Amino acid sequence: MQNITQSWFVQGMIKATTDAWLKGWDERNGGNLTLRLDDADIAPYHDNFHQQPRYIPLSQPMPLLANTPFIVTGSGKFFRNVQLDPAANLGIVKVDSDGAGYHILWGLTNEAVPTSELPAHFLSHCERIKATNGKDRVIMHCHATNLIALTYVLENDTAVFTRQLWEGSTECLVVFPDGVGILPWMVPGTDEIGQATAQEMQKHSLMLWPFHGVFGSGPTLDETFGLIDTAEKSAQILVKVYSMGGMKQTISREELIALGQRFGVTPLASALAL
């Protein structure tokens, strides 16, 4: 019998959650992570599955995700503990044939359940599947320190925030030319914030929840982690710059245009126009 904890997807989740905790982005039970899988990924590990998988209904049907397996972090679970006990802190779930709920196939032992942000994740997965023709498979939420700090001092506007991050570090425009979406503050763990996030995810791979955290999407765990890491690095630079009195010079609009042309990306027009 193959051990599922040695699979690429469990090992990938262990690395991503451990790295995020070491970055200081996921204190206590902060943050959550989901990865969309294929049946072929989990097929070799059926012997590891629960004999009687628990069924949990979704608060709203998601037919686009019907029959789709995911590996997810658990509700109330600490990222720092995933590496110590993957089966207690992670779970593999599979959405049923009509998208009305899911079965917990593996993990989430002792009656644990998936992250409370699962509605936001699943809704965002639906939108990113459509926006990227199925390329994006990961949704990651974390409490990236400097990005959160900037939501207290910058205007919480997509164009303004995006432009500042682009100017904070040259690689940002290349990594997220579609900019950073921003919501008003909302109560977490609700369908409302999930729907609002998913709506912005139609246009942006990176989302900010002011005074709370960040939501990122990408095709792989590494790409999604790297997306957030790049934005957070720029935010860290900006925090230092603002604390030293602000910018005296920066990357110009013309230089941003040239950067986009060099790397074959189309920058968010509203941010470029500022």
Swiss-Prot record:
Protein known as: Rhamnulose-1-phosphate aldolase
Active site: 117
Keyword Amino-acid biosynthesis: no
Record EC number: 4.1.2.19
Co-factor: note: Binds 1 zinc ion per subunit.
InterPro entries linked to this entry: Aldolase_class_II_sugar_metab (IPR050197), Aldolase_II/adducin_N (IPR001303), Aldolase_II/adducin_N_sf (IPR036409), Rhamnulose-1-P_Aldolase (IPR013447)
Annotated Zn(2+) binding sites: 141, 143, 212
Gene3D superfamilies with a match to the protein in the record: Class II aldolase/adducin N-terminal domain
Gene of this entry: rhaD
Pathway as given in its UniProt record: Carbohydrate degradation; L-rhamnose degradation; glycerone phosphate from L-rhamnose: step 3/3
Location of this chain's protein in the cell: Cytoplasm
Organism: Escherichia coli O6:H1 (strain CFT073 / ATCC 700928 / UPEC)
Gene Ontology cellular-component annotations: cytosol
Keyword Oxidoreductase assigned: no
Top EC group: lyase
Co-factor requirement: Zn(2+)
